[in-house]
UniProtKB/Swiss-Prot annotation:
Protein name stated in the entry: Citrate lyase acyl carrier protein
Similarity comment text for this entry: Belongs to the CitD family.
InterPro entries in UniProt: CitD (IPR006495), Mal_deCO2ase/Cit_lyase_ACP (IPR023439)
GO cellular component: cytoplasm
Keywords, in A-Z order: Cytoplasm, Phosphoprotein
Source organism of the structure: Leuconostoc citreum (strain KM20)
Localization of this protein: Cytoplasm
Amino acid sequence: MEIKKTAMAGTLESSDVQIMLSQGRDGITFDLVSDVAKQFDDAIKATITAVLALYGVDNAEVKVVDKGALDMVIKARAMTAVQRALDLADEPNWEVM
C-alpha cells in the first residue's frame, strides 16, 4: 500500500517513542534517534519494519525518536502511525492486530 499522507504517533515522554511516517521511494529508510541505539537499533527497526509489512507498505521514510520505549509500545505506535498514514484510522484492520 502507498502512504497517503505524513502521519505521526507517540510522544517525546520518557519510556515512549515518536514515529513519523511519510512517503518513500526506495524501500524503507530510517532516521533513528535514541540513547540506546547502539544496543537496540536493529530491534527497533525490525519491529517497525514488521508492522509496515503487515500493512503491505514497501516504501516509507520513517523518523523515530526513541525515549526508551519497550517493544510493545514501539509496535503500538507504529501501528497507529501506519493506520493514520494509510487513512485507515477510522477502519482499523483487526486482522493485523
